[in-house]
């Protein structure tokens, strides 16, 4: 697979941006994941995490999760929190967790809701799950609470992007650890461009206080939730200059929403698709693009969490 790398100067000329390098990943339109059944659960052990409450946003009593440590790891290792998409835990977390553990990084994939159980209250309803998970991770004697990362898909991608904001971090609670690096996958940038400037939205103005931390976004150029083929440009342009400098958007050319899905291709209707206008969404797995994204994410977390 070839990568077409654009210099900062080229990106600025074409898109009015001066703050990052964009990689377009040329992908083939492959319709099914690689042979063999996908592993649905992340490697490790099942754990039940005590819940927490975020006033005005919601509460959770307990959070089911899968926690895995690297084999033969040193006494303390970094860890990545994995947040699933609207369809629940579906194998994508396991796909990345295995590779992260092999690279020396522990993983914690939490279950925020079951398939079909997307909260009507929106993203704020699952922020308590993430806060509880981060608290639990820092309490583990084998995890270095100063070296935490967060990644997520779609619903979880939006969460992982928002958690890079100090405004959101303050709502999570002063005792909740601040992760050091974030890797959102297709976080539906077009919708967040509107939500973040809406005073009625619980995440209003979160973009104005994005932290200066490394952030790697993956999104397909044919994502049916988005408007246009470079949907995250406008969102990242809203962030403070220092945060923009630490952000990389990796566009997967020809990639759909969920291009790294570990289940067969599907179509469905979603009211939030097409930049909030609603309509049909295609999810077409591309194993080649998924493998490259996994390599990029593992390299990203290895660089910034230093296992």
Located regions from the model:
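N-terminal cap/lid segment of alpha/beta-hydrolase-fold proteins
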Residues: 39-73
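Short substrate-entry loop that stabilizes the transition state in hydrolases
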Residues: 73-77, 82-119, 191-192, 224-228
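Short beta-strand/loop motif that positions the catalytic acidic residue
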Residues: 217-219
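Bacterial N-terminal signal peptides
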Residues: 21-31
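Primarily recognizes the serine-hydrolase "nucleophile elbow" in alpha/beta-hydrolase
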Residues: 131-210
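Short alpha-helix in the alpha/beta-hydrolase fold that links the catalytic acid
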Residues: 227-238
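C-terminal catalytic histidine-bearing segment of alpha/beta-hydrolase fold enzymes
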Residues: 244-307
């Amino acid at each position: 697979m070839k990568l077409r790398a654009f210099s900062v100067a080229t990106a600025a000329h074409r898109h009015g941006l001066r703050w990052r390098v964009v990689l377009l990943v040329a992908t083939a339109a492959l319709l099914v994941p690689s042979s063999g059944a996908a592993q649905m659960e992340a490697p490790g052990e099942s754990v039940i995490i005590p819940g927490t409450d975020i006033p005005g946003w919601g509460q959770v009593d307990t959070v089911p999760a899968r926690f895995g440590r690297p084999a033969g790891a040193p006494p303390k290792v970094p860890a990545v929190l994995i947040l699933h998409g609207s369809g629940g835990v579906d194998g994508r977390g396991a796909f990345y967790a295995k590779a992260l553990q092999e690279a020396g990084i522990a993983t914690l994939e939490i279950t925020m809701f079951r398939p079909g159980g997307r909260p009507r209250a929106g993203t704020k309803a699952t922020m308590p799950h993430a806060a509880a998970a981060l608290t639990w991770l820092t309490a583990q004697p084998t995890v270095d609470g100063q070296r935490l990362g967060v990644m997520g898909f779609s619903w979880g991608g939006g969460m992982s992007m928002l958690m890079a904001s100090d405004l959101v971090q303050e709502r999570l609670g002063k005792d909740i650890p601040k992760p050091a690096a974030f890797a959102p996958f297709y976080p539906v940038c077009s919708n967040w461009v509107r939500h973040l400037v809406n005073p009625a939205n619980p995440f209003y103005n979160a973009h104005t206080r994005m932290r200066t931390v490394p952030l790697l976004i993956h999104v397909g150029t044919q994502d049916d939730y988005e408007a246009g083929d470079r949907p995250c440009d406008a969102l990242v342009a809203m962030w403070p200059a220092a945060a923009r400098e630490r952000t990389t958007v990796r566009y997967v050319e020809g990639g759909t929403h969920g291009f790294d899905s570990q289940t067969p291709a599907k179509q469905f209707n979603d009211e939030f698709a097409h930049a909030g206008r609603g309509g049909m969404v295609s999810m077409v797995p591309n194993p080649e693009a998924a493998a490259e994204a996994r390599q990029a994410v593992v390299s990203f977390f290895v660089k910034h969490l230093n296992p």
